[in-house]
Design a protein with these regions (language model features):
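Conserved micro-motifs of the catalytic ATP-binding
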Residues: 16-21, 59-66
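A conserved beta-strand-to-alpha-helix junction within the catalytic ATP-binding
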Residues: 22-37
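Short beta-strand/loop element within the Bergerat-fold HATPase_c
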Residues: 89-99
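Acidic ATP/Mg2+-coordinating residue in the GHKL
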Residues: 107
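Short conserved segment of the HATPase_c
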Residues: 112-124
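Short alpha-helical Gxxx[C/S/T] motif in the catalytic ATP-binding
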Residues: 141, 145
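Detector for a conserved hydrophobic position within an alpha-helical segment of the HATPase_c
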Residues: 149-150
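Glycine-rich ATP-binding loops of the HATPase_c
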Residues: 153-160
């Protein structure tokens, strides 16, 4: 129940007007490692690994401007969702270019039918019987992800995983945020 209340409060905060975001320069590589370290032990039969991680060629590493708490939450929601639906593998990759960055979370589960790609981000949406309260989902996680990335001037996308065959959820946003 506490988790549901937390999800609802987070969603309400992100949905109402413009939340106060404190954009900071963060190391995307470190964030990916942190989320994998936090979540990988929770489901021993699913291997959560880093996929291809490419940083900009400016010798400046994988830094991006983001609100650290919210970007962490978005990545955590996507990885835990992928783990819940994976058969045995989840992969987290990123690309940081000069102007834009992208994170891809792929799994080897059944995937999401293309006909449901847009509505999967709808609050309280569950596509099948595997997405029940018993599986740990409340139907708000992907809605929260979409709102978080919206406030970063980006997009949350879904496609079929080219590498693992299941779903691929992607976050894409500007590497630097516009100053107010």
């Amino acid at each position: 129940l506490d988790k549901l209340v937390d999800e609802m409060l987070t969603y309400a905060r992100l949905e109402q007007g413009s939340p106060t975001l404190s954009f900071q320069r963060i190391d995307l590589d470190a964030l990916v490692n942190q989320v994998i370290a936090e979540l990988a032990p929770l489901r021993a039969n699913v291997a959560v690994t880093r996929g291809q991680c490419l940083a900009a060629s400016d010798n400046d590493g994988a830094w991006v401007e983001a609100e650290p708490r919210y970007l962490h939450r978005a990545l955590q929601n996507l990885v835990s969702n992928a783990m819940r639906h994976a058969e045995s593998r989840v992969s987290v990759s990123y690309q940081v270019g000069q102007l834009r960055c992208r994170i891809d979370i792929e799994d080897d589960g059944p995937g999401v039918p293309e006909s449901a790609w847009e509505r999967i981000f709808t609050p309280f949406m569950r596509l099948d019987d595997s997405r029940t309260r018993a599986s740990g989902g409340h139907g708000l996680g992907l809605s929260i992800v979409r709102r978080i990335i919206y406030w970063h001037n980006g997009r949350a996308l879904i496609s079929k995983s080219k590498n693992l065959g299941g779903a691929c959820f992607s976050l894409a946003w500007p590497r630097q945020q516009e100053k107010p």
